[in-house]
């Protein structure tokens, strides 16, 4: 019946499979015919069909594989079942073969080890057959157990369960060597597995935990209660107490000694102040050494322990005495002798009354465990006799009577009129001498010499205030406010370190006839103040908080990580315009990788530009300079009020602005010694030059610093026209500018000759020599005077600063000659006190040549348009990433790392105020030769400027021209046998000397020297 059902199932499965296949083929043919009708194509154009139809659909394939798998496993199961069933039915009483017979053909372990190389295939075959036989036997036994059939006991079966000879072979197995840590870990793992298995078995068997038995507090009924008076208990207690008496006394001593020390302080010796101060330190140090050492009385008193055994014995004696309740009074001396060593001295002997037996605080009780000992009773009262009153009392000193202060009679100061009425009448002829030496433009000195100061001081005395009078000439300050006075000499020029003599001296000096010979300038102390400038301006919204800096630091790290550049922001500095973040690249990250991401990082952070500082001097990190969302306005008054500018003693101090942290930046032009400023239009170049000029005007008087200004644009520097610091009017014509530079070269040569004669190395040494001679009342004559018999005296030489606003226009006008003059001044003019400030908006190589750059090491670069311009100015990149509006890079001489500075803003209103303030103190003293150029009409600076050496054949050429009466280049060339260029220069020199005229329209020249003079 079973076989019939199985066959029917197989047939149905096959029929279903064929039905699905036929159905799929029918559907496929229907789709093909529909496709043919739609496309209208021929049968030949259809794709080829394999086996009449395409592949099965997915559902058919899945069904086919499922049926195939089911049929396979069903067939395997039926075959196994039939085999087992037929085997048991055919041989129900088949005896189990002996195990020894089955193992006879199986090779042992020793056989395998001995003959491992021979007969490998035979051994494998025998092992396979033996394994099949054992499997069959085991299966028979298992089948018998399942069928509940008893198997008769057979010794062969028992022998089969015993270990074989190969298993108890003397051959040692090969063990794996492991470490102790691995073995411990394996044992722990095995223990955990065993515990887990035990708990799992208990859970599967539904084992319940044994309930805990609650112990009753009351004894069971019928038991005998043993009290404290039981003889056995008392005997046991006595033996235990005697055995532990020594240990207990020592432990009790440790517990009661602090109480004894606290309640009976008079029982100890006197404690020194030093020991009392050291006691807390000893107690703190003793906490880690045990309770006994920390609580000992000698440590409490700040004393060192020298003999530990003696102290321990003393403790034991004290503990024994404390347990004797019959003693009511204990001698203090005896107790102290037991507590401290014999070497200690005892100060004071008084008896301390101990409490009685009923009030004994050390009561003996028996504990619940049968151990007794003294226990401290907190409820007991303690009575200690008060110490005796001291023999001497501290007596306060008697009160000091108050002594009334004696009245001091101070004479009132004399009235102002008495001070100002002390006048001095100069000797005869003094006024004429002074008038000849003082310039006519010095109105202040004229007023003083004419006696105008007496009228003003009298008006001040009548009014009663020093600042009440004003000059009738319209000056801002009065005489007394500008110059000051004292009780010994009243002179408006008293504190003025200048070259001109003071107009009034004290009476003593007048009697002695001590008149300073050095001239003093009246305007030396008329320096402008910061009141003329706009006050500082601070915008609190432009400051960045710590949270914003931290957020930007995290953003920088994340954005650089996106470009596979790992860095860490270590610090940040927030300034008025930018914020610098110092980053430390990770190990293996090059600095160029951060530099190449400059524009990408700026775009990612949403800022206009980022400047990457590859090297920060003194640090091991790089720098990222990001612009602030809002920038601060830096006023010029903020820099002038700073200590850096105020404490600078140089007359050529330049205020540049603030650095990235907001600190003022000032420099000394005398140490520069020349300055090159370059930047595009609108970068703040002209404003920076104005700030530098105002810095020198605020620091130096006209007798200290003189200026020559060249302004091709006629707008920037023309505002300074008329200030007393100018040597010449502001030059706006470039042809005259070359003359000014030529005069500077001649002045430089003149000063070098004077310094060589004086034996000094710079201008400061020369001026010091002049000042020392004037202090001695001597005068130094000019060694190069045109009148050697009566030479004019040498005077103090001021610094000369040449400011050129647009250097490129000057280079285009004069060209090569201007470059030579600038190079000569840059090379040699430093020691002569002549300094250059060159500014240009076209930083190209034809303007800033290599010769100029080599001699001007100090440079300032404002914002430029390209990296090439930045390299032209600074010899490195970075200026193209500046922000404009005064943002600059300042390169100091001798350094390769420029400093970023934010320039101070000088408005036109501030410049006008300072100029008007300076104009009121006098007209400038111009030098006419600066712009005239000696009256020559040719290109200034090109004719004879600098040609101090005359051609040795010049006289012969003049003689030839005068004899022949022909001024031709070819005639001079033939007569002197020289080249054309040299002959042409000689003719040009004759024209400059006025010997021949300029060439006419036909090229002929007329000899201007008469024949008689020839």
Swiss-Prot record:
<dbReference type="Pfam" id="PF09397">
    <property type="entry name" value="FtsK_gamma"/>
</dbReference>
<dbReference type="InterPro" id="IPR036388">
    <property type="entry name" value="WH-like_DNA-bd_sf"/>
</dbReference>
<dbReference type="InterPro" id="IPR027417">
    <property type="entry name" value="P-loop_NTPase"/>
</dbReference>
<feature type="binding site">
    <location>
        <begin position="682"/>
        <end position="687"/>
    </location>
    <ligand>
        <name>ATP</name>
    </ligand>
</feature>
<dbReference type="GO" id="GO:0005524">
    <property type="term" value="F:ATP binding"/>
</dbReference>
<feature type="region of interest" description="Disordered">
    <location>
        <begin position="497"/>
        <end position="525"/>
    </location>
</feature>
<keyword id="KW-0238">DNA-binding</keyword>
<dbReference type="InterPro" id="IPR002543">
    <property type="entry name" value="FtsK_dom"/>
</dbReference>
<dbReference type="InterPro" id="IPR041027">
    <property type="entry name" value="FtsK_alpha"/>
</dbReference>
<dbReference type="GO" id="GO:0007059">
    <property type="term" value="P:chromosome segregation"/>
</dbReference>
<protein>
    <recommendedName>
        <fullName>DNA translocase FtsK 2</fullName>
    </recommendedName>
</protein>
<dbReference type="GO" id="GO:0015616">
    <property type="term" value="F:DNA translocase activity"/>
</dbReference>
<feature type="transmembrane region" description="Helical">
    <location>
        <begin position="1"/>
        <end position="21"/>
    </location>
</feature>
<keyword id="KW-0997">Cell inner membrane</keyword>
<keyword id="KW-1133">Transmembrane helix</keyword>
<dbReference type="GO" id="GO:0051301">
    <property type="term" value="P:cell division"/>
</dbReference>
<feature type="domain" description="FtsK">
    <location>
        <begin position="662"/>
        <end position="871"/>
    </location>
</feature>
<comment type="similarity">
    <text>Belongs to the FtsK/SpoIIIE/SftA family.</text>
</comment>
<comment type="function">
    <text>Essential cell division protein that coordinates cell division and chromosome segregation. The N-terminus is involved in assembly of the cell-division machinery. The C-terminus functions as a DNA motor that moves dsDNA in an ATP-dependent manner towards the dif recombination site, which is located within the replication terminus region. Translocation stops specifically at Xer-dif sites, where FtsK interacts with the Xer recombinase, allowing activation of chromosome unlinking by recombination. FtsK orienting polar sequences (KOPS) guide the direction of DNA translocation.</text>
</comment>
<dbReference type="GO" id="GO:0005886">
    <property type="term" value="C:plasma membrane"/>
</dbReference>
<keyword id="KW-0547">Nucleotide-binding</keyword>
<dbReference type="Pfam" id="PF17854">
    <property type="entry name" value="FtsK_alpha"/>
</dbReference>
<comment type="subunit">
    <text>Homohexamer. Forms a ring that surrounds DNA.</text>
</comment>
<dbReference type="GO" id="GO:0003677">
    <property type="term" value="F:DNA binding"/>
</dbReference>
<feature type="compositionally biased region" description="Polar residues">
    <location>
        <begin position="298"/>
        <end position="307"/>
    </location>
</feature>
<keyword id="KW-0472">Membrane</keyword>
<feature type="compositionally biased region" description="Acidic residues">
    <location>
        <begin position="121"/>
        <end position="140"/>
    </location>
</feature>
<dbReference type="InterPro" id="IPR018541">
    <property type="entry name" value="Ftsk_gamma"/>
</dbReference>
<feature type="region of interest" description="Disordered">
    <location>
        <begin position="89"/>
        <end position="142"/>
    </location>
</feature>
<keyword id="KW-0131">Cell cycle</keyword>
<keyword id="KW-0132">Cell division</keyword>
<keyword id="KW-0067">ATP-binding</keyword>
<keyword id="KW-1003">Cell membrane</keyword>
<feature type="region of interest" description="Disordered">
    <location>
        <begin position="281"/>
        <end position="318"/>
    </location>
</feature>
<keyword id="KW-0812">Transmembrane</keyword>
<keyword id="KW-0159">Chromosome partition</keyword>
<dbReference type="InterPro" id="IPR036390">
    <property type="entry name" value="WH_DNA-bd_sf"/>
</dbReference>
<dbReference type="InterPro" id="IPR050206">
    <property type="entry name" value="FtsK/SpoIIIE/SftA"/>
</dbReference>
<dbReference type="Pfam" id="PF01580">
    <property type="entry name" value="FtsK_SpoIIIE"/>
</dbReference>
């Amino acid at each position: 019946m079973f076989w019939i059902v199985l066959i029917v199932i197989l047939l149905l499965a096959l029929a279903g499979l064929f039905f699905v296949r036929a159905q799929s083929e029918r559907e496929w043919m229907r789709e093909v015919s529909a496709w043919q009708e739609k496309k209208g194509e021929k049968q030949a154009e259809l794709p080829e069909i394999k086996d009449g139809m395409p592949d099965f659909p997915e559902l058919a394939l899945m069904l086919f594989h499922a049926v195939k798998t089911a049929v396979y496993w069903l067939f395997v199961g039926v075959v196994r079942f039939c085999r087992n069933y037929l085997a048991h039915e055919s041989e129900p009483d088949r005896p189990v073969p002996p195990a020894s017979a089955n193992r006879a053909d199986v090779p042992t372990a020793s056989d395998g080890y001995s003959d491992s190389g021979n007969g490998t295939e035979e051994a494998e075959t025998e092992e396979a057959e033996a394994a099949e036989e054992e499997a069959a036997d085991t299966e028979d036994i298992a089948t018998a157990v399942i069928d509940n059939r008893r198997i008769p006991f057979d010794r062969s079966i028992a022998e089969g369960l015993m270990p074989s000879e190969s298993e108890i072979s003397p051959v040692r197995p090969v063990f794996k060597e492991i470490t102790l840590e691995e073995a411990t870990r394996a044992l722990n793992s095995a223990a955990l597995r065993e515990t887990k298995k035990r708990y799992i078995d208990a859970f599967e068997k539904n084992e319940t935990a044994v309930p805990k038995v609650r112990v009753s507090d009351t004894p069971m009924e019928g038991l005998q209660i043993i009290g404290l008076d039981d003889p056995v208990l008392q005997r046991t207690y006595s033996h235990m107490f005697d055995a532990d008496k020594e240990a207990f006394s020592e432990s009790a001593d440790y517990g009661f000694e602090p109480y004894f020390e606290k309640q009976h302080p008079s029982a100890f010796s006197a404690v020194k102040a030093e020991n009392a101060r050291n006691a807390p330190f000893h107690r703190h140090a003793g906490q880690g050494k045990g309770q006994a050492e920390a609580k000992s009385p000698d440590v409490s008193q700040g004393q060192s322990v020298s003999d530990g055994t003696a102290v321990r014995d003393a403790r034991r004696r004290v503990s024994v005495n404390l347990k004797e309740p019959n003693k009511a009074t204990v001698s203090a001396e005896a107790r102290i002798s037991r507590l401290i060593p014999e070497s200690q001295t005892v100060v004071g002997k008084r008896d301390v009354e101990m409490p009685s037996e009923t009030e004994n605080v050390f009561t003996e009780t028996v504990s619940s465990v049968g151990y007794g000992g003294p226990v401290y009773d907190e409820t007991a009262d303690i009575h200690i006799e008060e110490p005796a009153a001291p023999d001497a009392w501290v007596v306060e000193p008697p009160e000091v009577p108050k002594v009334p202060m004696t009245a001091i009679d101070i004479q009132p100061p004399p009235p102002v009129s008495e001070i100002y009425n002390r006048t001095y009448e100069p000797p005869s002829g003094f006024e004429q001498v002074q008038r000849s030496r003082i310039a006519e433009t010095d109105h202040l000195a004229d007023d003083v010499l004419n006696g105008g100061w007496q009228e003003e001081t009298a008006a001040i005395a009548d009014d009663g205030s020093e600042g009440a009078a004003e000059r009738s000439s319209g000056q801002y300050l009065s005489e007394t406010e500008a110059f000051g006075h004292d009780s010994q000499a009243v002179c408006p020029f008293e504190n003025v370190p200048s070259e001109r003599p003071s107009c009034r001296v004290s009476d003593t000096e007048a009697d002695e006839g001590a008149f300073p010979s050095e001239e003093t300038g009246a305007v030396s102390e008329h320096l402008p103040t910061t009141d003329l400038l706009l006050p500082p301006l601070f915008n609190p919204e432009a400051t960045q908080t710590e949270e914003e800096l931290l957020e930007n630091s995290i953003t920088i790290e994340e954005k650089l990580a996106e470009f596979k550049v790992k860095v860490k922001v270590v610090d940040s500095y927030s300034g008025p315009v930018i914020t610098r973040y110092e980053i430390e690249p990770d190990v293996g990250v090059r600095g160029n990788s951060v530099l190449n991401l400059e524009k990408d990082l700026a775009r990612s952070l949403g800022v206009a530009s980022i400047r990457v500082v590859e090297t920060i001097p003194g640090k091991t990190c790089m720098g990222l300079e990001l612009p602030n969302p809002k920038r601060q306005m830096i006023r010029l008054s903020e820099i002038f009020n700073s200590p850096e500018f105020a404490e600078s003693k140089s007359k050529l101090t330049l205020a540049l602005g603030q650095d990235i942290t907001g600190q003022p930046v000032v420099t000394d032009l005398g140490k520069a010694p020349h300055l090159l400023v370059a930047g595009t239009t609108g970068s703040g170049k002209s404003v920076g030059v104005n700030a530098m000029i105002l810095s020198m005007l605020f620091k130096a008087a006209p007798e200290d610093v003189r200026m020559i200004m060249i302004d091709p644009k006629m707008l920037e520097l023309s505002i300074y026209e008329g200030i007393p610091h100018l040597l010449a009017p502001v030059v706006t014509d470039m042809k005259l500018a070359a003359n000014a530079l030529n005069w500077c070269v001649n002045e430089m040569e003149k000063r070098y000759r004077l310094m060589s004669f004086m034996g000094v190395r710079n201008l400061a040494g020369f001026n010091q020599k002049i000042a020392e001679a004037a202090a001695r009342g001597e005068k130094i004559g000019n060694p190069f005077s045109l009148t050697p018999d009566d030479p004019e005296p040498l005077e103090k030489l001021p610094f000369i600063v040449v400011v050129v606003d647009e250097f490129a226009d000057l280079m285009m006008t004069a060209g090569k000659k201007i470059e030579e003059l600038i190079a000569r001044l840059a090379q040699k003019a430093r020691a002569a006190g002549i300094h250059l400030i060159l500014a240009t908006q076209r930083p190209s190589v034809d303007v800033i040549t290599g010769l100029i750059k080599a001699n001007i090491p100090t440079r300032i670069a404002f914002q430029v348009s390209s990296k090439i311009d930045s390299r032209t100015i600074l010899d490195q990149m970075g200026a193209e990433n500046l922000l404009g509006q005064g943002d600059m890079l300042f390169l100091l001489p001798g350094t390769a790392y420029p400093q970023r500075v934010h320039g101070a803003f000088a408005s036109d209103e501030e410049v006008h105020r300072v100029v008007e303030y300076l104009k009121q103190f006098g007209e400038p003293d111009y030098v006419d030769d600066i712009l005239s150029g000696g009256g020559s009409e040719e290109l200034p600076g090109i004719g004879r400027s600098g040609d101090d050496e005359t051609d040795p054949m010049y006289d012969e050429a003049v003689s030839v021209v005068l004899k022949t009466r022909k001024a031709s280049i070819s005639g001079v060339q033939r007569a002197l046998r020289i080249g054309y260029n040299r002959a042409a220069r000689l003719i040009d020199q004759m024209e400059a000397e006025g010997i021949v005229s300029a060439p006419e329209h036909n090229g002929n020249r007329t000899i201007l020297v008469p024949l008689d003079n020839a």
